[in-house]
């Protein structure tokens, strides 16, 4: 039996028994599976809610436990903690990829290891716990699973994500607005590719491609940093 058919193992792993098991099934259903089966709910709406719940819990924790840090410092730390890479690492620790329902095509192209799919599933899982058990239980789940990430971030042991790093480089010269613009997207809903450019006014700094908007923006920022480093070498 595939693990997504029996979620008792996952419930034991996260030490949470769901009252409404349907919420957990939806949280672990990728859009590609829903497209194949029709009339099946998938996890994008839960992902939307889970992102906000995660932001709230981490923000509250940092606010209450790091009273010596300024708003700006806390915002930077939160950006390090609540990012796609962190969510991916949580998903890997929970072996979440084994439980996700997805299309055969998605699975054959590496969907169970894809960063964006796993990160989104963690956010959806957080939302499902929140809806089923409330804020206290989901807070405990988040702080338990993100504890090491929070500790490393506060000890400056996590490398900045590319968007944050680019922002810090650019804003050394003042409060300059950086814009991420989605140029286009292509492909079926379960395998959509996003193209993003990062600009300052009319100056394009870099382009990025990814299987989520977040991933394409991070790759655009990474390319912008690389381009800036190359230009420095030839100045």
Swiss-Prot record:
| SMART domains registered for this protein in UniProt | DSRM, RIBOc
List, in alphabetical order, the GO biological process terms annotated in this UniProt record: mRNA processing; regulation of gene expression; rRNA processing; tRNA processing
* Catalyses which reaction(s): Endonucleolytic cleavage to 5'-phosphomonoester
Q: Which UniProt keywords apply?
A: Cytoplasm, Endonuclease, Hydrolase, Magnesium, Metal-binding, mRNA processing, Nuclease, RNA-binding, rRNA processing, rRNA-binding, tRNA processing
UniProt subcellular location: Cytoplasm
The annotated active site, in chain numbering, is 51, 123
InterPro entries according to UniProt: dsRBD_dom, RNase_III, RNase_III_dom, RNase_III_sf
Any one Gene Ontology molecular-function term assigned to this protein's record: metal ion binding
Q: What GO cellular component is one of the record's annotations?
A: cytoplasm
What is this enzyme's EC?
3.1.26.3
Recorded hits in SUPFAM superfamilies, A to Z, give:
dsRNA-binding domain-like (SSF54768), RNase III domain-like (SSF69065)
Per the record, the domain of life is Bacteria
Q: Which cofactor does it need?
A: Mg(2+)
In what residue span(s) does the DRBM domain sit? 161-230
Q: What is its main location?
A: cytoplasm
Binding residues for Mg(2+), per the UniProt record? 47, 120, 123
The RNase III domain, residue ranges: 7-134
Q: Which family does it belong to?
A: Belongs to the ribonuclease III family.
Checking PANTHER family in the record gives: RIBONUCLEASE 3 (PTHR11207:SF0), RIBONUCLEASE III (PTHR11207)
Q: What does this protein do, in the record's words? A: Digests double-stranded RNA. Involved in the processing of primary rRNA transcript to yield the immediate precursors to the large and small rRNAs (23S and 16S). Processes some mRNAs, and tRNAs when they are encoded in the rRNA operon. Processes pre-crRNA and tracrRNA of type II CRISPR loci if present in the organism.
Q: Quaternary structure?
A: Homodimer.
This protein's name: Ribonuclease 3
Record organism: Clostridium tetani (strain Massachusetts / E88)
């Amino acid at each position: 039996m595939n693990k997504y058919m029996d979620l008792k193992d996952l419930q034991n792993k996260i030490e949470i028994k769901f009252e409404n098991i349907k919420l957990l099934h939806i949280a672990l259903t990728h859009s590609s599976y829903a497209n194949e089966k029709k009339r099946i709910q998938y996890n994008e709406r839960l992902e939307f809610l889970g992102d906000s719940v995660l932001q709230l819990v981490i923000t509250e924790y940092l606010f209450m436990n790091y009273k010596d840090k300024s708003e700006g410092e806390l915002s930077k730390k939160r950006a390090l903690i609540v990012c796609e890479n962190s969510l991916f690492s949580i998903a890997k620790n929970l072996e979440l990829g084994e439980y996700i329902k997805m299309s055969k095509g998605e699975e054959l192209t590496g969907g169970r290891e894809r960063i964006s799919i796993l990160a989104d599933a963690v956010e959806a899982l957080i939302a499902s716990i929140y809806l089923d058990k409330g804020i206290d239980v989901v807070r405990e789940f988040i702080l338990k699973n993100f504890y090491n990430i929070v500790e490393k971030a506060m000890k400056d042991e996590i490398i900045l994500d590319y968007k944050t790093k680019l922002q810090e480089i650019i804003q050394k010269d003042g409060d300059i607005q950086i814009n991420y613009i989605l140029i286009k997207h292509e492909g079926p809903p379960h395998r959509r590719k996003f193209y993003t450019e990062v600009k300052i006014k009319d100056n394009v700094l870099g382009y990025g491609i990814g299987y989520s908007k977040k991933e394409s923006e991070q790759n655009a920022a990474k390319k912008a940093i690389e381009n800036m480093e190359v230009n420095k070498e030839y100045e």
